[in-house]
Design a protein with these regions (language model features):
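Membrane-helix interface/capping residues of multi-pass secondary transporters
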Residues: 43, 52-55, 92, 121, ...
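Short alpha-helical transmembrane segments in multi-pass integral membrane proteins
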Residues: 1-25, 83-150, 192-247, 303-368, ...
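Hydrophobic transmembrane alpha-helices of multi-pass small-molecule transporters
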Residues: 67, 182-186, 212-216, 287-290, ...
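Helix-terminus/linker motif at the lipid-water interface of multi-pass membrane proteins
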Residues: 33, 37-55, 125-132, 188-195, ...
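N-terminal transmembrane alpha-helices
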Residues: 12-44, 48-49, 63-78, 82, ...
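Transmembrane helical elements of multi-pass membrane transporters/channels
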Residues: 23-42, 144, 178, 207-211, ...
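Small-residue-rich hydrophobic transmembrane alpha-helices
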Residues: 55-115, 152-171, 277-341, 372-394
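Short runs within selected transmembrane alpha-helices of multi-pass transporters and secretion channels
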Residues: 76, 145-163, 171-179, 200-213, ...
């Protein structure tokens, strides 16, 4: 065990970052692409039901799934950042205690979300942005998704902890296996067993449970930290570090959910087609950015290990390398998305009104999409270094500080076109805000070590 950990330490602190980050990133990129693909699978197969209300319901419930994911990322990123730095310090005892504390805390929180959500199902559906016509579909989909909340939150913790230990391959196997299963189960449950939109939800939670089991097995392999209930330490010290490391993710994911709710509320004025179109565009853009997020996840353990070991020059090298690669990637994705916008939207809902609304929104977002390379890599760098204040500020900037007020202001002044262009405006403002903050972080890394 100790020999495996020492070899992993040498790998993370001595291999050139231009070789190490792609090696760490490849499983993460595959995981993110497959995850984004199966997130779109529900939208695709539900779209085949030929109902704008059903397609809209998937978009409405997506905001709650984002909240559940936010909880998972809070505990996963919070514990994972701590783990990577402590392994960098060769402090394996505290790293092991943090792993168990983060995992079981997320599991308990998922159970709480499940119980409360089922108790207040209909009010929750309206809060998420459901209309009266969408409500029956929303309740059918939402009630099943809530049942999977415990393992949805805890599997994200396992995924993040494995990545931060440099074991992204185990994380990839767990995530991709569940994703492939989901894609197979969707048509079976929706059409063959005639479960409709509820079948899509069952496919999602069954596949995520399989992922959870495989990720749990991965924690016992390759010198990774093992999870034990006896290792859970309900100490303020550990929860403070979870809070510091996970708050940016909670803020980012949580506000993404709030932003989706605001978007649905603004779009509902223009009918089910508008809600369906904006939901489809969200899924497309998520898929477009998934490779960038995956590459950044490959950068994070490299950042954490080397920051913990005091090798600040490697942290800076890794940041610049990641920004360059992801900028080129997003530029290519943006060009393809802009050129093929009508065709992409029509894959999920072949309705003229949905296609028209979605095409304009997708093209607006493609204009500024490549700027996310600097914003996201910078935010991941800040978060992994434990710089809670700038990391949290930048995490809330895009969807909270800028998007939420922008979508309401533009909706009131420009109507539907304002809703369609709101994300583009928010992305530009976020980039302008992030430049001086990340420059300050890079200067901090250039200062003499104390």
């Amino acid at each position: 065990m100790e020999d495996q950990q020492q070899k992993k330490y040498q790998l993370m602190t001595e291999t050139p970052v231009s070789r190490l980050i792609p090696r760490m990133a490849l499983p993460c990129v595959v995981s993110m692409l497959v995850t984004a693909f199966y997130n779109m699978a529900d939208t695709f197969f539900v779209g085949m039901l030929k109902s704008n209300a059903a397609t809209g319901a998937v978009g409405v419930v997506f905001s709650l799934m984002a909240i559940i994911q936010a909880i998972g990322f809070f505990f996963g990123q919070g514990s994972g950042n701590f783990i990577s730095r402590e392994i960098g310090h060769k402090n394996y005892q505290e790293a092991s205690e943090m792993a168990s504390t983060g995992f079981f805390s997320a599991l308990a929180t998922g159970v709480l979300i499940c119980v409360l959500g089922l108790l207040f199902l209909e009010p929750l559906a309206y809060l998420l942005g459901s209309t009266d016509t969408i409500l029956p579909y929303t309740k059918a989909y939402l009630s099943v998704i809530l049942l999977g909340a415990p393992w949805m939150t805890s599997s994200l913790v396992l995924n993040n902890q494995l990545r931060f230990q440099g074991s992204a391959a185990y994380a990839m196997v767990g995530i991709t296996s569940g994703a492939v299963l989901n894609i197979g189960l969707d048509p079976l449950l929706i059409f063959v067993l005639n479960l409709g939109i509820a079948g899509a939800a069952w496919a999602t939670i069954i596949s995520q449970f399989v992922s959870f089991c495989l990720l749990l097995i991965g924690c016992t392999k390759g010198g990774n930290l093992k999870l034990h209930l006896s290792h859970v330490k309900l100490k303020p010290y550990y929860y403070l570090w979870i809070f510091k490391g996970g708050l940016p993710s909670l803020a980012r994911q949580g506000l993404a959910s709030v932003a989706t709710i605001c978007l649905n509320q603004a779009a509902r004025t223009y009918g089910d087609a508008a809600i369906a179109a904006m939901g489809v565009v969200q899924r497309i853009m998520m898929f477009g950015g998934s490779a960038m997020i995956g590459f950044g996840q490959g950068f994070q353990p490299v950042c954490g290990f080397n920051y913990g070991a005091g090798l600040y020059h490697r942290v800076k090298e890794g940041f610049w390398f990641s920004v360059k690669v992801t900028f080129v990637l997003l530029l290519a994705v943006s060009a393809a998305g802009f050129a093929c916008a009508p065709q992409l939207v029509s894959i999920f809902r072949d309705d003229p009104e949905v296609i028209a609304i979605g095409t304009a929104a997708l093209r607006f977002q493609c204009v500024t999409f490549c700027l996310q390379s600097w914003v996201v890599m910078g935010n991941m760098c800040q978060q992994t270094m434990g710089l809670t204040v700038p990391a949290t500020f930048m995490a809330v900037a895009r969807q909270g500080l800028f998007f939420i007020p922008t979508v309401w202001i533009l909706a009131l002044t420009l109507g539907l076109p304002g809703i369609q262009m709101a994300q583009m405006v928010a992305d530009l403002l976020t980039f302008l805000c992030s430049v001086p903050i990340q420059i300050w972080v890079l200067k901090k890394l250039s200062q003499p070590q104390k």
